[in-house]
Regions:
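Catalytic cores of alpha/beta
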Residues: 77-89, 100-101
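Glycine-rich, proline-tolerant flexible connector loops at the mouths of alpha/beta enzymes
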Residues: 28-29, 37-55
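Short, acidic/polar
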Residues: 21-33, 74-82
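Hydrophobic faces of well-ordered beta-strands that scaffold small-molecule active sites
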Residues: 16-20, 40-42, 68-71, 91-93
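Conserved small/polar residues in nucleotide/adenosyl-binding loops
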Residues: 112-114
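C-terminal helical cap(s) of enzyme catalytic domains, especially alpha/beta-barrels
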Residues: 100-110
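N-terminal amphipathic alpha-helix/helix-capping segment at the start of soluble metabolic enzymes
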Residues: 1-19
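Glycine-enriched alpha-helix->loop->beta-strand junction motifs that scaffold or abut catalytic
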Residues: 35-39, 85-90, 110
Length: 114
């Protein structure tokens, strides 16, 4: 899978994103990609969006060539792994207030390659 946002950031290019809170249509990824955005921020913390809708939007966004990034509702391993399994290419945890919490959250998502 191509992560357009990551590629642009690593190349020092401008990378534009847009936040999504109210829209529930899978077409939003295509609309935002056509509008010139590189990534889509899907917010599961500040609305009633569930994993099914976030997943559908993430998959459709990838298909449209836009990177889906999801903010999960809380510090829970299963929230992060589920959105990644369902198509998100990045996860944002809310209310990370210190380095120890950040390290713990990173450890949730670190993969050991066998």
């Amino acid at each position: 899978m191509k992560n357009i946002a990551k590629e642009k950031i690593l190349n020092g290019e401008l990378c534009l994103g847009v936040g999504l809170r109210q829209s529930r249509t899978v077409d939003i990824g295509k609309i935002m990609a056509t509008s010139g955005y590189d990534w889509l921020f899907i917010d599961m913390e500040h609305n009633s969006m569930d994993i099914d809708i976030a997943s559908q939007i993430s998959v459709a966004a990838q298909d449209a060539g836009i990177t889906p990034i999801v903010r999960v509702p809380e510090f829970a391993h299963h929230h992060a792994t589920r959105v990644l399994d369902c198509g998100a290419m990045g996860v944002v945890f809310p209310h990370v207030e210190n380095a120890d919490i950040a390290k713990k959250l990173v450890s949730y998502l670190s993969l050991i390659h066998i």
